[in-house]
Amino acid sequence: MATSKEYYLYVFDLLREVEGISSKKMMGEYILYKNSVIFGGIYDNRFLVKKSSSLEEYEFKEVIPYPNAKVMLLVDLEDPFVVKEIVNTLYKELSK
């Protein structure tokens, strides 16, 4: 099942507080970037971010976005300011 345009717009609205966000549509799903660094994606109407020890405090559910993929974390929050904190924390770790 591909991600709906409505869900994509919903997630992009959640990311409105984060600077440098972009996306690329691939095979019906979306890859998410911050300043050209991949931090997550939208798969089957699920907002997922890369697994990281720096995000353990949030206790996100681990999911597999598609067969043979690495485990990712399901972001089920609706607060754009918390989402901003999560993305910025992950970006700092990934851009080292």
Where are these predicted regions, by residue range?
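Charge-dense, helix-prone N-terminal extensions
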Residues: M1-K96
